[in-house]
């Protein structure tokens, strides 16, 4: 009996084949809408005095920063073809070098995090300098963390629809049509194929093997699980504004770091720290570290710094308010 699952033949990157509207693009639209609605609902629920037009300006900067940051990180850090260095305008255009429409398929969330902080910081210190958006900025980051994590899984489902970001070889896994095939002469390949019921014919030089659906695992833990932890646990123990955002960054980085062990390293990059070169299907090492894991460690440390800094800001406000009350 076959011990693998074939990728659904009816599933395609486009919502309707032949029409350039992709699940990936729709996932971003829905995540933005969910975040916009949720954050505004929280503002109204907590009776925070922020004008709608100021909030929309803030959200525009946040979305723009996230997209630019994610796009820059994907094209300049992960892509090693050199196409974006020789044709930098392609970074911000939904076309390839031959002007075929592709949409914005390459995004890296680590860069998105950075852009989603830098762009709003710029706008609240310029256009929104004298508004309550600046006053409640840290509170808004907390709202945004819960909002984004609630819709995050949509992006990973879109990755699955694209048959991309799949995991390593596993019995009972899914045979992704776009996965890189293995040379049948690689040690362990024929034995593995035979053990799961895949037939290798004498003339077959390459074979596609089942993979871990790591994009779905990432989506589950970095999305719903993280969101529930933020909402039901950390929201209740929150002592100051900015705390939840810092915790969210650390939670995301924590889950991402360990789930990366299940994920196939990026083809162009491989392992950044290649302690033990992999020569067969059965070999594995926790000391082989990918780019995603390195960036996740940086992100985790950044989240910790955010928690510490925002705690000091909160303590300073309490001290100033106490001194003011004492003087009065």
Curated annotation (Swiss-Prot):
GO terms for biological process: lipoprotein biosynthetic process. Signal peptide: none annotated. The chain crosses the membrane at residues 15-35, 58-78, 106-126, 242-262, 289-309. GO terms for molecular function: phosphatidylglycerol-prolipoprotein diacylglyceryl transferase activity. It is found in: Cell inner membrane. It comes from the Bacteria. Pathway: Protein modification; lipoprotein biosynthesis (diacylglyceryl transfer). Its EC number is 2.5.1.145. A 1,2-diacyl-sn-glycero-3-phospho-(1'-sn-glycerol) binds at residue 156. One of its GO terms (cellular component) is plasma membrane. Its main location: membrane. Pfam families: LGT. Keywords: Cell inner membrane, Cell membrane, Membrane, Transferase, Transmembrane, Transmembrane helix. PROSITE patterns: LGT. It is a multi-pass membrane protein. Catalyzes the transfer of the diacylglyceryl group from phosphatidylglycerol to the sulfhydryl group of the N-terminal cysteine of a prolipoprotein, the first step in the formation of mature lipoproteins. HAMAP family: Lgt. Belongs to the Lgt family. This is Phosphatidylglycerol--prolipoprotein diacylglyceryl transferase. The lineage of its organism: Bacteria, Pseudomonadati, Spirochaetota, Spirochaetia, Spirochaetales.
